[in-house]
UniProtKB/Swiss-Prot annotation:
PANTHER family: 60S RIBOSOMAL PROTEIN L23A. It comes from Shewanella sediminis (strain HAW-EB3). The gene is rplW. Part of the 50S ribosomal subunit. Contacts protein L29, and trigger factor when it is bound to the ribosome. This is Large ribosomal subunit protein uL23. Keywords: Ribonucleoprotein, Ribosomal protein, RNA-binding, rRNA-binding. Transmembrane segments: none annotated. The keyword Ribosomal protein applies.
Length: 99
């Protein structure tokens, strides 16, 4: 059993991009930025509990941070994790909340 506190820390934000919009329209898939140490089971449980929807599958990937120049020094951006969450037929998540 995953604690309530942990579930609230797993999902950081929805990831909005051209690809995520196409996935949402065609495949009933929503894309989230998640904690780097989050597992697929935690992501599935968090989405199911927070948005009250049924989740079919979860696919995750880690985006490696890019090396960037800041003045004379070289810096590195932070690695971050993204999760593609496929919802069951008939389920949808409304981020806008408009009726």
């Amino acid at each position: 059993m995953i604690s309530q506190e942990r579930l609230l820390k797993v999902i950081l934000a929805p990831h909005i991009s051209e690809k995520s919009t196409v996935c949402a329209e065609n495949d009933n898939t929503v894309v989230f930025r998640v904690a780097i140490d989050a597992t697929k089971a935690e992501v599935k449980a968090a989405v199911a509990q927070l948005f009250e929807v049924e989740v079919d599958s979860v696919r995750t990937l880690v985006n490696k941070g890019k090396t960037k120049r800041t003045g004379a020094r070289m810096g590195r951006r932070v690695d971050w994790k993204k999760a593609y969450v496929t919802l069951a037929d008939g389920a949808e998540i409304d981020f806008v909340g408009a009726e």
